[in-house]
Amino acid sequence: DYSSGLNLFSNFKNVVITRTFSKIYGLAGLRVGWGYASKDIINALSRIKPPFNVGRPALFAASAAIRDSAWLNKEIKHVNKWNEILFKEFNKMKIIKNKSFTNFILINFDKLKIKSHKVFRLLANSGILVRKMDVYGIKNSLRITIGKSMENKKLIFRMRRILNV
């Protein structure tokens, strides 16, 4: 189950919890987020942060996103639905994957004869962009962002063809 971590923040003075608008809010390019911390930590961070560190358009977009709870709830349902579908589909394909509570899923090809770099190339040739994880020390794996329903269906179709299942 998902844990916000707020219990850690409530029980310890040295805990900082950060959140981003990049994932569920879909505002990755704006680099906007927020955090929870004790007043002492917030004061220390405020002394070293640059002035005007977030532009007005980004603040406006983040503010609008936070107020639109109907859209957020719809997006959460979409991500949860597709997390479950992709988890089951990748399981059928014998791909190693972790249960995810985010808008992306990590898949590993160690139990298959095909390597992640080849799958990456074949998906890219089909217009499906995923992220290689080798640069993060996670070998033979890809990170797949949950997209729109049609994009996810295309991914499943293409993965079945690549793996001949």
Regions found by a protein language model. Give the residues of each.
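Short beta-strand-to-turn element immediately C-terminal to the catalytic PLP-Schiff-base lysine
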Residues: 32-39, 107
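Short acidic/glycine-enriched loop/turn segments that link adjacent beta-strands
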Residues: 29, 101, 137-140
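Short helix-loop capping/hinge motifs at secondary-structure junctions, enriched
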Residues: 39-44, 112
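Active-site pre-lysine segment of PLP-dependent enzymes
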Residues: 1-24
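PLP-dependent enzyme catalytic core of the Aspartate aminotransferase-like
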Residues: 122-131, 135-165
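Conserved PLP-binding catalytic core of the aspartate aminotransferase-like
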Residues: 80, 84, 92-126, 142, ...
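Conserved PLP-dependent catalytic core of the aminotransferase class-I/II
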Residues: 43, 63, 67-97, 119
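Active-site PLP-lysine loop of aminotransferase-like
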Residues: 16-28, 45-56, 134-135
